Amino acid sequence: ARTQPGNIAPVGDFTLYPNAPRQGHIVA
């Protein structure tokens, strides 16, 4: 899944944010 900055994303969901794998929300 892809992520956007703002909310917590599941661990491992860091397609667009490899430097912040726990930041962002799923926008898949």
From Swiss-Prot:
Biological-process GO terms, alphabetical: negative regulation of translation
Documented EC number(s): 3.2.2.22
Reaction(s) catalysed by this chain's protein: Endohydrolysis of the N-glycosidic bond at one specific adenosine on the 28S rRNA
UniProt keyword list: Hydrolase, Protein synthesis inhibitor, Toxin
Gene Ontology molecular functions: rRNA N-glycosylase activity; toxin activity
Function of the molecule: Inhibits protein synthesis in animal cells. Does not possess ribonuclease activity.
Family of the protein in this entry: Belongs to the ribosome-inactivating protein family.
Name the record gives this protein: Ribosome-inactivating protein pleuturegin
Species assigned in the record: Pleurotus tuber-regium (King tuber oyster mushroom)
Lineage: Eukaryota, Fungi, Dikarya, Basidiomycota, Agaricomycotina
